Amino acid sequence: MVSNNAVIIKKYLDSTAGYPVIGEHLAFEKREFDLENAQVDEETPVLLKNIYTSVDPYLRMRMQSPKHASYIPPLELGKPFYNSTVAKVVKSTLDQYKPGMDVVFVSGWEEYTFVSKQALGFLQPINNPYKLPLIDFVGSLGMPSQTAYCGLKHIGKPKAGETIYISAASGAVGQMAGQLAKAMGLHVVGSVGSDEKFKICLDSGYDSVFNYKKESPFKALPRLCPKGIDIYFENVGGETMDAVLENMNLQGRIIFCGAISQYNNPNPYRVKNLGMVLVKSLTIQGFIVANILPQYQEQYFEEMPKLIAEGKIKYKCDVYDGLESAPEAFIGMLQGKNSGKTIVKIADE
C-alpha cells in the first residue's frame, strides 16, 4: 500500500461569506492506495502520479453551492479539488499514453488519479523540445499565462505605442501580461499590494508600478498614464475599475479577466462610473480562456516555450512543498500573500 492523500472540499461557501476555513470548507485527508494491484481497464484506461498542481483564483468560484454556481460547476462535496496538473503515467491500456510519459491533465489534488475514457481529451502529452523544467507546464506555460496571451490578442488588440494598465501586476496572469505587452511595444503600467511585488514588476520590465495600499489608483493613474489608458487588463475588481474608467481613452478596451478582490467580499463594490463606457465608446469584454484558447493554442506553443528557453520571459512562482500545504497555499493566494504564480509540488519527478 502507498499513500494517496488528497485535499477535499467539505462544505460549500458562497462568495459573500468570506474566506474558506481550513478544516471546515476544505481539508487535507490521509488515504491509502493499493498501487501494485490497481487496475486500468476500458472505463479508466490510465493511472497518473501527480507531480505539480496549479492553484488558481477561479477555484474559489467552484466552492459555491449549486444554487449560486458560476460559469463552471461546483466541486463535488467530499471529493478532491482538481486543476491543471503535471503528472506521470503509471499504468495504461493505451499505446499513446505509455508508462513514464509526462502529461498535463485536469487532475485531482491527490497523489494518484485514474483517468476515465470520457476525460481522455483533457490528457495532453508534454511536448518539450527546449527541455524546460516540468513545473513550467503549470507555471510559465500554464493556464494563467495562456489567459494573458489570449486576453491580449483576442480583446486587447494592442498597437505599438499604446498604454496598458494591468492590475494584480505580479500575479499569475499579470506578470505574463505585462511582459507580453512590453514585447508588443506598449507602455506598461501595473499596480500591486506590496513593496516585494513592486520590485518583481520592475524587474520583469514594467515601465511604471504603484502600490495601491500607499497610493489610490485615482491619484496614481493620472500621474503614471498622462496620455490616458488604451487597454486595461482587469484582475482585481472593486473601485479600481472606477479609477480606470475616468482615465480610459476613446475606444479603449477593457479585458475583464477576474475580480479577486470581490471573490470573498461580503459587501461587493458597485461600479459608479459605467456612464464612461458610453461617453468614451469603450469595449468591456469578459472571457473564459478555455473558450478562446483553441484559436491561439498552436501559435502560443510555437512562440512561448522559445521565449522562456531564451530567457526573454521571466516568471516567478511560489512553490509549496507537499500536498498538505495546498489549503494554506490556496487561501494565501486568495488573500494576496503570494508574490507570483502559486503551485503545489505533490511529489518528486
UniProtKB/Swiss-Prot annotation:
Principal location: cytoplasm
Classification via CDD domains: PGDH
GO MF annotation list: oxidoreductase activity, acting on the CH-CH group of donors, NAD or NADP as acceptor
InterPro entries documented for this protein: ADH-like_C, ADH_N_2, GroES-like_sf, MDR_fam, NAD(P)-bd_dom_sf, PKS_ER
EC number: 1.-.-.-
Pfam family, one: ADH_N_2
Subcellular location: Cytoplasm; Nucleus
Claim: Nucleus is one of the keywords in the record: yes
SUPFAM superfamilies according to UniProt: GroES-like, NAD(P)-binding Rossmann-fold domains
Claim: Nucleus is one of the keywords in the record: yes
Family annotation (Gene3D superfamilies): Medium-chain alcohol dehydrogenases, catalytic domain, NAD(P)-binding Rossmann-like Domain
Domain of life: Eukaryota
Annotated GO CC locations: cytosol; nucleus
Keywords: Cytoplasm, Nucleus, Oxidoreductase
Membership in a protein family: Belongs to the zinc-containing alcohol dehydrogenase family. Quinone oxidoreductase subfamily.
Protein's name according to its UniProt entry: Zinc-type alcohol dehydrogenase-like protein PB24D3.08c
